[in-house]
Amino acid sequence: MAAQGFLLIATFLLVFMVLARPLGSGLARLINDIPLPGTTGVERVLFSALGVSDREMNWKQYLSAILGLNILGLAVLFFMLLGQHYLPLNPQQLPGLSWDLALNTAVSFVTNTNWQSYSGETTLSYFSQMAGLTVQNFLSAASGIAVIFALIRAFTRQSMNTLGNAWVDLLRITLWVLTPVALLIALFFIQQGALQNFLPYQAVTTIEGAQQLLPMGPVASQEAIKMLGTNGGGFFNANSSHPFENPTALTNFVQMLAIFLIPTALCFAFGEVAGDRRQGRMLLWAMSVIFVICVGVVMWAEVQGNPHLLALGADSSINMEGKESRFGVLVSSLFAVVTTAASCGAVIAMHDSFTALGGMVPMWLMQIGEVVFGGVGSGLYGMMLFVLLAVFIAGLMIGRTPEYLGKKIDVREMKLTALAILVTPTLVLMGAALAMMTDAGRSAMLNPGPHGFSEVLYAVSSAANNNGSAFAGLSANSPFWNCLLALCMFVGRFGVIIPVMAIAGSLVSKKSQPASSGTLPTHGPLFVGLLIGTVLLVGALTFIPALALGPVAEYLS
């Protein structure tokens, strides 16, 4: 089984790296404000029709555009969900959502989290799924990519005060990156057997003679952008373990590839725009090392079996509880690490049923800030924060002013970096503490002891870091949990974007200094090790006490 696991990991890494390289070149053109071939005329007509000016923006204007679009989208989606019973494409006559669930869901999809306190097939109409959630899957992904576009320009431009035009970037990302790739993936899913229709739910008779109601809907179109945009919210409650969403082993492999495609391509694009492709490869090496180690740990833990079942005399040589038999332990373990490393949150297995160590790794990947590939855009700008921190630490050790790509990293940048890095740990630890101190928080726990605490910690970690997956043993559809997690999702998303954009505004005005004999190389194995160490150190110092009360205590008990 070890050989099978190694082959699976190696094949996955090879395929997504090969696919991401050409996409990275296309993204580099967009970052450099060079239209893709054959798109100039279409863009000119669209910009004119929409009244979009291509005048460049400073960081405050760029940030205002991103925030304005997302807040408007939140309001529209909130009222759409409240009044879905008045809207078309609702063959099951599903009622509108309660205010707290509508708020939680709207914030969830606008922030690219896709936390779901509901079952899609029994709660949302086709219109809400298609015009509400799927639209936000595109816009939230485009927003994250636009932010990293601005940050990359800040590192590569000299003595300027503008970072591009947010509206131009959003349109280009949506039209020329997300839409065509998502369309190809959706067509492939349909060919493989995923649903794509507007039929009412179908009553069928099973082979045992019982009646069953099969849900229908425009699934494939939402599934494609759900994975490509690292959104993760399922059309059905079972998410990607549902055969109508993920019908074959081939679609499952493509879903994993789609999750990592854009985050990897952005690393290639960064190196190309920076004029030193080694910089992008350095980031990919750091991410890949952490990723492979985490996959190996989860596979090992799940192959060992469930010790509690073994103690009861059951045959549990491997831990198949909560896993699809058509995917198995190894693929389920790989998918769990992919979806939590990349802030996607889609699942093909119940993470709540993983072993203590097997469930701790996905939780920890979220807690370090979703920087191991991470979400589209958000993963790379999150990792760039750790790059700046690593450069600062190295500068302290060698007694030089820290710099990255020739730009001095001053006190202002480091204060903003520290602020951005501390946002999500603060939300996770304070949110979990609040939940454990209140009756409303504890009443949602379906399990006692360390595992019950792990469910709470996982939920808040998932929300604050915009992942969206869950340990499902938590009854989170209550006003307390819907509001708490909505707050964590909103602040966890925009509380990081704001300082990142401020860092971009500060760096873009600086002039790059030529490298000297005392300049720390940021493209070699030494810096890769320093970056990995920085990520691990911050994660360990912040979350080891909380993890010790949850999965570690469960493992030792």
Curated annotation (Swiss-Prot):
Matching Pfam families = KdpA
Gene Ontology terms, cellular component aspect? plasma membrane
Q: Which GO terms describe its molecular function?
A: P-type potassium transmembrane transporter activity; potassium ion binding
Q: Which InterPro entries match?
A: KdpA
Alphabetical keyword list = Cell inner membrane, Cell membrane, Ion transport, Membrane, Potassium, Potassium transport, Transmembrane, Transmembrane helix, Transport
Give the transmembrane region(s). 5-25, 63-83, 132-152, 170-190, 253-273, 283-303, 329-349, 356-376, 379-399, 416-436, 484-504, 526-546
Q: Which superkingdom?
A: Bacteria
Membrane topology label: Multi-pass membrane protein
Primary location recorded for the protein, binned into one broad class = membrane
Q: Where in the cell is it found?
A: Cell inner membrane
Q: Matching NCBIfam families, A to Z? A: kdpA
The protein's assembly and partners: The system is composed of three essential subunits: KdpA, KdpB and KdpC.
Q: What does this protein do?
A: Part of the high-affinity ATP-driven potassium transport (or Kdp) system, which catalyzes the hydrolysis of ATP coupled with the electrogenic transport of potassium into the cytoplasm. This subunit binds the periplasmic potassium ions and delivers the ions to the membrane domain of KdpB through an intramembrane tunnel.
What family, per the record? Belongs to the KdpA family.
| Stated name of the protein | Potassium-transporting ATPase potassium-binding subunit
